[in-house]
Amino acid sequence: ERVGKKLQKISVGATLYKDLNTCREILTRGLAAFNKELDKDLLAEGVQKILDRLIFLRVAEDREIEPPTLIPLIREWEKSKTGEHLYQSMVKKFRELDEIYNSNLFSPHPVENWEEYSGATEKVVKILYGKPGYYEYDFKAMPADVLGNVYENYLGYKLAESQKGATLTKDVRKRKEQGIYYTPTFIVDYIVNNALKPVLDNCRSVADLKKIKVLDPACGSGSFLIKALEVIYE
């Protein structure tokens, strides 16, 4: 809280959306500067992979699924005298997480072998914690539909070359081709409650619950799956 100044209310979704776009541009410039031979599509894919991993870790930290990871990693790197870049330390952490989660998110990707320039990774990590003195992100308190809405809108933009190296432009065709559309919360609630609750009503034990399988073949940001988990938990 700042004394003597009136705090302005800001939209969490709008602020996060803006910050994610900033992160995307920073990573693109930081990786493109030392990897000029990369094709634009592969570069965009690599940037998205890194950002996906960092967002996952921020959510996992705040929801206490993972211990604080990113800031401690920066502090360790700052104290280290090995000459290793923060980006390389981050890649090592990704390899550890791949052993734990065994998912496509942390599986090896060419981006891990690229050179990073100008402290891009450090800048992006700090942005994902918020702006000191103004706001902080708490992903534990942030509703899943807010994060999902922001993320699906964010995916509807593409990277384009500019004098600064990279800018984001809205790509209507990409949204249409890839089916990137946000499903309103009330629709998610209605469909999940009507499809899943009758099944849950017939469960009489934990063993019955373990037999349930929930499939969303076009999950996007996972709104339906997150709601399904909430309903099962309740």
How would you describe each model-predicted region?
Residues E1-Y233:
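Preference for the N-terminal adenyl/adenosyl cofactor-binding alpha/beta module
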